[in-house]
Amino acid sequence: MGKVLEKEAFGLAAKDESGILSPFSFSRRATGEKDVRFKVLFCGICHTDLSMAKNEWGLTTYPLVPGHEIVGVVTEVGAKVKKFNAGDKVGVGYMAGSCRSCDSCNDGDENYCPKMILTSGAKNFDDTMTHGGYSDHMVCAEDFIIRIPDNLPLDGAAPLLCAGVTVYSPMKYHGLDKPGMHIGVVGLGGLGHVAVKFAKAMGTKVTVISTSERKRDEAVTRLGADAFLVSRDPKQMKDAMGTMDGIIDTVSATHPLLPLLGLLKNKGKLVMVGAPAEPLELPVFPLIFGRKMVVGSMVGGIKETQEMVDLAGKHNITADIELISADYVNTAMERLAKADVKYRFVIDVANTMKPTP
């Protein structure tokens, strides 16, 4: 595809390991016959964006335009696109491509494809780098575009494309979505608060598990959790032993697993979706004597992401956000590093991100 066919774009990019974002002009590919192009209206800020901007995992190629919680309105579709039209409300999440032929792709688990292409900071099949949603427009293959229900506000829907499917996918896959089940949610941050909302929509009993008593009212009164446990209170934890069918652990800080395993019923599942930087100690005896499982999960496939968003539309589920302007992004990143956000930053891209003269 020649340069003459590419379209100019602008956004915010990190250009070195300081992680500081600054204006950046670049080119996006022309709209291919199976591509969808859309104007970006809002983009959520995920902790992964911060880690990648600072090259904390040693994987970053600069310049990096972050953003994988992207929503907007379709402006152009390719000749062979069948599912979308100009004016549709759409989004793109954590991935923008995969091989589409491996076992994972054939099973609808594109998120586990060995050749999965991340929406931001990854090498595409044509050897160009992908640039994320901190930008004025996106172009993506039709098969990786998500339709956003008309009744959902786009700013609050944006984080669902990462945070939402990250908690929804393991609930569905591990059968923790049955009405009447008892589900624990560890941590009440960007992932945890959305997990509570989806678990309640599925008809389960939800207990939030936190180190902080201060979050009790927020969890129970505002988010609708059925119960709240302070994990540092031995009596509370003891009284709840053996009561939960599954636990979604959203915490990325190092923390003990033994107390959480104690909360599970026999055959219960502890699902890790947070990613602590240091290894966690895993006690084996509770697993052996209760046939309990500790498993991991990462975002979700395209089909289940669409199912998640559709369920959100049915139950009016959105993330609780702080809407920010593009010129506040670096401050937001500093606050995010200190966990100073309730619960997700979202950039008002369309109204505040303008190209430099």
Curated annotation (Swiss-Prot):
Cross-referenced Pfam families: ADH_N (PF08240), ADH_zinc_N (PF00107)
Binding site for NADP(+): 48, 166, 187-192, 210-215, 250, 274, 297-299
InterPro entries: ADH-like_C, ADH-like_N, ADH_Zn_CS, CAD-like, GroES-like_sf, NAD(P)-bd_dom_sf, PKS_ER
Molecular function via GO: cinnamyl-alcohol dehydrogenase activity; zinc ion binding
Keywords in alphabetical order: Lignin biosynthesis, Metal-binding, NADP, Oxidoreductase, Zinc
Pathway of action: Aromatic compound metabolism; phenylpropanoid biosynthesis
UniProt family annotation: Belongs to the zinc-containing alcohol dehydrogenase family.
PANTHER family assigned: ALDEHYDE REDUCTASE
Protein name per the record: Cinnamyl alcohol dehydrogenase 7
Source organism phylogeny: Eukaryota, Viridiplantae, Streptophyta, Embryophyta, Tracheophyta
